[in-house]
Amino acid sequence: MADIITLACTECKQRNYTTTKNKKTKPERLEFNKYCRFCRKHTPHRETK
C-alpha cells in the first residue's frame, strides 16, 4: 500500500511537494533534486514526517 509523503526543501525547510511511496519496499527516506519556488533554485528535497 502506497502512502502519501511530503518533500521539504533542505535549505529553507518549506514543504513544496507531495508524492507516494511504498514503505515496505523502500524503508529509507527519499531525496530528490527539485525546484524550490521560495529559494528560486534547484535544491535537494527530503522526505519529512
UniProtKB/Swiss-Prot annotation:
GO terms for cellular component: cytoplasm; ribonucleoprotein complex; ribosome. NCBIfam families: PRK00504.1 (NF001764), PRK00595.1 (NF001860), rpmG_bact (TIGR01023). GO terms for biological process: translation. Belongs to the bacterial ribosomal protein bL33 family. PROSITE patterns: RIBOSOMAL_L33 (PS00582). It comes from Syntrophotalea carbinolica (strain DSM 2380 / NBRC 103641 / GraBd1). GO terms for molecular function: structural constituent of ribosome. Keywords: Ribonucleoprotein, Ribosomal protein. This is Large ribosomal subunit protein bL33. HAMAP family: Ribosomal_bL33. It comes from the Bacteria. InterPro entries: Ribosomal_bL33, Ribosomal_bL33_CS, Ribosomal_bL33_sf, Ribosomal_zn-bd. The keyword Nucleus does not apply.
